[in-house]
From Swiss-Prot:
Compositional bias (Low complexity): 683-692
Modification type Phosphothreonine: residues: T183, T810, T1093
Species, as recorded: Cavia porcellus
PANTHER family: NON-SPECIFIC SERINE_THREONINE PROTEIN KINASE, PROTEIN KINASE DOMAIN-CONTAINING PROTEIN
Protein name from the UniProt record: STE20-like serine/threonine-protein kinase
Coiled-coil segments on the chain, per record: 822-1065, 1105-1179
Acidic residues: compositionally biased ranges: 312-328, 641-660
UniProt site (Cleavage): D431, Q432
Active site annotation, chain numbering: D155 (proton acceptor)
Enzyme Commission identifier(s): 2.7.11.1
């Protein structure tokens, strides 16, 4: 076995080397350096702990993330790199990072103030505008720094903005942030939290054509500002996935009540929430906006001090009452007259419910309450109850008769809208005043304070609100420089009663009212309401002085003490309308908060455990402008908590009994109303005074009369409807004669004037409409009610402040927490999904990039290989040609040498023969000379020798020259032959070389075309892969969305089942109590009108009992039918929701397929265009190549021609060959 196989078996050296990161310490135990001292929370990807450095004692927030692999570890490197690279006072700093035992520890700067959303939840109210300004400016500076460093945060929200104890903010959570490499780089990832996503980010879910840049953070900033102003972001009532469609298609969100906020704030939001990205301002531009010119962070320091204050909690149980206490003696109440146009019109279902309920003959009185909380009024019938009137539960509270509306049989929203009185829309400048008495909007947490002798808070059951599916509405707090307006407007949807608590105060004008929880248990009902305006100090004083004449004397007691305290600067009572966080369909009970600011010399705390209530008796009608309550959708009165701030100086605490004695029987102070002059006349009087005495009961001490309610209509100007505009100095209070009522339960609209009614018939009406087949009774509510009292003590700028918050604790609180937890779970699931999608997208992008690199590398290799192949062939051809030429030249040289030798040999022989002939001739001359005489012989010999020598020399030269010419001719002929042969070979070689070059170019062109095709196919396949992943991710999101929808629907069904079970269980008890009460009252009426004999009375009683049994049976059947209808409607609604969801999902899938088809088509068109352009460029390339070949061929021909001619110009010139083989001349020959 080889060593390499051995290594494979034991995996020696095969382990992948761990990647080292710059800011992450590996294989070091973080617990050796940091001590965990507590848990801060549970994030989407792991727990967050509070840690302390063992050496420096520096605190840190340690995020511990379980990472299974190196690939998962890389997902968090972007966050760590961004944190490490950022150095800004408003961005959290990275203190340390460890990777130990598959856990990634990220230790960041600890911010003790907590997140903005957590502070709002803790204090149960949104931020004020000054606080928002501070947060906004510092957040803008942080964003501007990030954007300058090419970083997009992509998850900006209140939960990611942290407070420090110094009153500054730190931007955190860069888990989904993007770090670009270029300034103008854009992104196309669908990532972030839906509620805060910019429209261009939302569009990336189905289309990557329009990527986004840094301005996506600016949109998120605008949404975050709305979140801080209203506790929840816009569209928070929607599912996290479904809100995306809302963002993409609807107009940019705005503040729910713009009039409560400054114009700078609204303009700033407008600049942030601009759907057109090009028109949206950048962070640097926004920093120049006047909204963020604030320099001090004092508002945040006060906020943090309050949020981090010491909290003392106290739970008070509500008193229990027996069922028998419901039965009250008749009250001497004057009868009311009813207008002929106010006849009740009941729905068909209510006809069936109450057809047997009209037993007693006379006028009945009914206080109805709008189901949406927008209006309520008192209705009086001058005939016996019609069969169509709803059967509503009635409680006798403090002598007043209240009728419980039928919550289960509400009309649909459109029906409510049609029945409401059409009220004039108030201008924005008067929204503050109108908001003070605006009704609680739909789905809001309504409260009533009611009992036998006092008024207590009564909460509507959470389940009924869920059933109604009313939108969750938010509260807004308005704060100007020197005036704070806070309002509490409470409606009990159980009793139809509405209590209005209005406190408008500034630093100079104060009206204090006390109503402690103990007073609610006193014999007399004491109620006060303080009303002031939002104008300047002088205007307020004038307005407060404008109390109706009939109420002045009794109002003095209520206002006198408050005025005294104001003059002395001792006590300030501020009622702040705040709101607890609300999940979809749920709200929290608004607690009453009291802030007591005491100086060092006097540390007295005045408790105010309940809101001041405006009693709504049977003669009063309260209505409000629908334009504010319904259309605006959010009211100050929808708060989850109400704070009353009381600052005490050296004034002693007012005794509760004194306050009671002063306020007992005193009317409520009411400001005058300025109404429009063109209102229609009404038959009701201009001023109405109502007194409802309460007779003593056997089980209780004799109660005092209910305080009179004086309403001045200001010379009967308010004669028509109530929706007239108000000026900025007034606060509208209800006038019973001008109100119209919309009863959503029975479809009945009626008005009542302020005449007296007959109690017997009122009770009869009450009994005929009682409890609406199982609605929660007041006694049940009182038994379930607990009051949670929180007291916060903290110091702001050396002044100790105490805040007391009283909140009624019901099941709705836990339900709210549960729904908020479920919503967080949904967001967490979405975050996980996004993280998985991002990882999968990164993996796919890496894979596709690798594929592109591989194919381009292959293209290059193929091209180089093809070129190398043809270059090699051309080189071989040239080498072969060279060798051939060299061989031929060698052959030609050898042949020429041989031929020259041969000719030379022949010429030498001929020359030798010629020389022999010359010798013979010389001999002959010698012989001839010898024959001459001797004396002449010597001279003749000499002369004849000279002649012979000359002639022979000339002959020999001629002979040699002739031989040379013959030799040159022969060699020339041979050379020409060789030249022709070489030219042919060169031409053939050039042709072969050009053919190879043509083949090379053709192969290159073919390769280029094939590469274009392959590149197109690859890009097409990659595009399909990308869209396949998008479809897969979209389907996963749809599955998650469907799963969440099914869970939501299942919760609704379960809640409805539980509520129906409770109603079925309550109905027999209610019926028994009713039967007992009705029988007692029937017998009492028989005793009063005792004209018949005892037998006749017994028969009437039997008949009444039979009718009661029949009525109860009908009630049970009606309840059963109602429950079936409710379940059927709910199931239909759930099915409709699922269908709508599937339709939206199909639209998204269809849109994605359309985008894919469009992109594929564009890709094909691009390929066709590219191919066309390539082919167009190919023709000139071919032409250029052929021209080059022709030029080279011509050059070769000219070369060979010129060479041949140059050598033939001088025939006597020796050739290159003959030069080396000279013919011997006469000088070289022997003689």
């Amino acid at each position: 076995m080889s060593f390499f196989n051995f290594r494979k078996i034991f995996k020696l050296g095969s382990e992948k080397k761990k990647k080292q990161y710059e800011h992450v310490k590996r294989d070091l135990n973080p617990e050796e350096f940091w001590e965990t001292i507590g848990e801060l929370g549970d994030g989407a990807f792991g727990k967050v702990y509070k840690a302390q450095n063992k050496e420096t004692n520096v605190l840190a927030a340690a995020k511990v993330i379980d990472t299974k692999s190196e690939e998962e570890l890389e997902d968090y490197m972007v966050e760590i790199d961004i944190l490490a690279s950022c150095d800004h006072p408003n961005i959290v700093k990275l203190l340390d990072a460890f990777y130990y035992e598959n856990n990634l520890w990220i230790l960041i700067e600890f911010c003790a103030g907590g997140a903005v959303d957590a502070v709002m939840l803790e204090l149960e109210r949104p931020l004020t505008e000054s606080q928002i300004q501070v947060v906004c400016k510092q957040t803008l500076e942080a964003l501007n720094y990030l954007h300058d460093n090419k970083i997009i945060h992509r998850d900006l929200k209140a939960g990611n903005i942290l407070f420090t104890l110094d009153g500054d903010i730190k931007l955190a959570d860069f888990g989904v942030s993007a770090k670009n490499t270029r300034t103008i780089q854009r992104r196309d990832s669908f990532i972030g939290t839906p509620y805060w996503m910019a429209p261009e980010v939302v569009m990336c879910e189905t289309s990557k054509d329009r990527p986004y840049d840094y301005k996506a953070d600016v949109w998120s900033l605008g949404i975050t500002l709305i979140e801080m102003a209203e506790i929840e972001p816009p569209h928070h009532e929607l599912n996290p996935m479904r809100v995306l469609l809302k963002i993409a298609k609807s107009e940019p969100p705005t503040l729910a009540q713009p009039s409560r906020w400054s114009s700078n704030f609204k303009d700033f939001l407008k600049k942030c929430l601009e759907k057109n990205v090009d028109a949206r301002w950048t962070t640097s531009q926004l920093l120049q906006h006047p909204f963020v010119t604030i320099d001090s962070n004092k508002p945040i320091r006060e906020l943090i001090a309050e949020a981090k204050a010491e909290v003392t909690e106290e739970v008070e149980d509500g008193k229990e009452e027996d069922d028998d206490e419901e039965i009250e003696n008749s009250l001497p109440i004057p009868t009311n007259k009813r207008a002929s146009s106010d006849l009740s019109i009941a729905s068909s279902e209510e006809d069936k419910l109450s057809q047997n309920a009209c037993i007693l003959e006379s006028v009945s009185e009914k206080t109805e309450h709008n189901a949406s909380g927008d209006k309520f009024s008192t209705k009086v019938l001058n005939e016996k109850p019609c069969p169509g009137e709803p059967e509503n539960a009635v409680e006798l509270v403090g002598g007043a008769v209240a009728v419980l509306p039928d919550r289960a049989t509400e009309l649909p929203e459109s029906g409510r809208e049609e029945k409401r009185p059409k009220l004039d829309r108030l201008p924005d400048t008067e929204d503050q005043e109108m908001a003070d008495i605006n009704s609680v909007s739909e789905g809001e947490e309504d409260h009533a304070v009611t009992s036998e002798t006092n008024i207590e808070h009564n909460l509507k059951p959470e389940k009924e609100r869920d059933q109604e599916k009313q939108p969750v509405l938010e509260n807004k707090l308005v704060k100007s420089e020197d005036t704070t307006i806070q309002t509490v407007d409470l409606v009990s949807q159980e009793t139809g009663e509405k209590e209005v608590d209005i406190h408008i105060l500034d630093s100079e004008v104060v009206h204090a009212v006390e109503d402690t929880h103990e007073k609610l248990r006193k014999d007399d009902t004491t109620q006060k309401d303080v009303i002031s305006d939002t104008s300047s100090v002088g205007e307020r004083d004038e307005e407060i002085g404008a109390v109706p004449k009939t109420a002045e004397s009794s109002a003095e007691g209520a206002q006198g003490d408050g005025g005294k305290e104001t003059d002395e600067g001792a006590q300030i009572l501020i009622s702040k309308a705040t709101e607890g966080p609300k999940a979809s369909g749920t709200e929290e009970a608004p607690p009453v908060t009291e802030i007591t600011e005491t100086n060092d010399t006097d540390q007295k705390l005045v408790e105010n455990t309940h809101e001041k209530q405006l009693p709504i008796s049977s003669e009063t009608t309260l209505d409000t402008s629908e334009g504010l309550g319904a259309s605006e959708g959010r009211e100050v009165t929808e708060s989850g908590s109400t704070e009353e701030v009381e600052v005490e100086g050296a004034v002693s605490e007012t005794d509760e009994e004194d306050v009671q004695s002063e306020t007992r029987g005193a009317p409520m102070a009411v400001t005058q109303m300025d109404t429009e002059k063109n209102e229609t006349p009404h038959e009701a009087p201009a001023q109405v005074e109502v007194q409802v005495p309460v007779p003593p009961q056997p089980s209780e001490p004799p109660p005092a009369p209910i305080p009179s309610i004086n309403i001045n209509s200001e010379a009967a100007e308010n004669k028509g409807e109530m929706g007239a505009s108000l000026n900025t100095e007034t606060i509208l209070l209800p006038e019973s004669e001008s109100q119209k009522e919309n009863d959503t339960d029975s479809g009945t609209g009626s008005t009542a004037d302020n005449s007296s009614i007959d109690l017997n018939l009122s009770i009869s009406s009450f009994l005929s409409k009682t409890k609406d087949n199982g609605s929660i009774s007041l006694q049940e509510t009182r038994r379930q009610k607990k009051t949670l009292k929180k007291t916060r003590k903290f110091i702001v700028d050396g002044v100790e402040v105490s805040v007391t918050t009283s909140k009624i604790v019901t099941d709705s609180d836990s339900k709210t927490e549960e729904l908020r937890f479920l919503r967080r779970q949904e967001l967490r699931e979405l975050r996980f999904l996004q993280k998985e999608e991002q990882r999968a997208q990164q993996q796919l992008n890496g894979k596709l990039q690798q594929q592109r690199e591989q194919i381009f590398r292959r293209f290059e290799q193929e091209m180089m290989s093809k070129k190398r192949q043809y270059d090699q062939e051309i080189e071989n051809l040239e080498k072969q040609q060279k060798q051939t030429i060299e061989r031929l030249e060698q052959e030609h040289t050898n042949r020429l040498r041989d031929e020259a030798k041969r000719i030379k040999g022949e010429q030498e022989k001929e020359l030798s023969k010629f020389q022999n002939i010359l010798k013979n001739r010389k001999k002959e001359v010698l012989n001839e000379v010898e024959k001459a005489p001797k004396d002449l012989r010597k001279e003749l010999m000499k002369r004849r020798k000279e002649e012979l020598a000359q002639s022979q020399h000339v002959q020999e030269q001629d002979f040699v020259q002739k031989q040379q010419q013959e030799l040159d001719g022969s060699l020339k002929k041979i050379i020409q032959q060789q030249k022709a042969e070489l030219a042919n070979i060169e031409r053939e070689c050039l042709n072969n070389k050009q053919q190879l070059m043509r083949a090379r170019e053709a192969a290159i062109w073919e390769l280029e075309e094939r590469h274009l095709q392959e590149k197109h196919q690859l890009l097409k396949q990659q595009l399909k892969d990308q869209y396949f992943m998008q479809r897969h991710q979209l389907l996963k999101r749809h599955e998650k969305e469907t799963e969440q929808m099914q869970r939501y629907n299942q919760r609704l069904i379960e809640e409805l089942k539980n509520r129906q079970t409770q109603e079925r269980a309550r109905l027999p008890k209610i019926q028994r109590s009713e039967a007992k009460t009705r029988m007692a009252m029937f017998k009492k009426s028989l005793r009063i009108n005792s004209t018949a004999t005892p037998d006749q009375d017994r028969d009437k009683i039997k008949q009444f009992s039979a009718q009661e049994e029949k009525r109860q049976k009908n009630e049970r059947m009606a309840q059963h039918q109602k429950h079936e209808n409710q379940m059927r409607d709910l199931q239909l609604q759930c099915e409709a929701n699922v269908r709508e969801l599937h339709q939206l999902q199909n639209e998204k899938c269809h849109l994605l397929v359309e985008h894919e088809t469009q992109k594929l088509k564009e890709l094909d068109e691009e390929h066709s265009q590219e191919l066309k352009e390539w082919r167009e460029k190919l023709r000139p390339r071919k032409k250029t190549l052929e021209e080059e070949f022709a030029r080279k061929l011509q050059e070769q021909e000219v070369f060979f021609k010129m060479t041949g001619e140059s050598e033939c110009l001088n025939p006597s010139t020796q050739s290159r060959i003959s030069k080396f083989y000279p013919i011997p001349s006469l000088h070289s020959t022997g003689s």
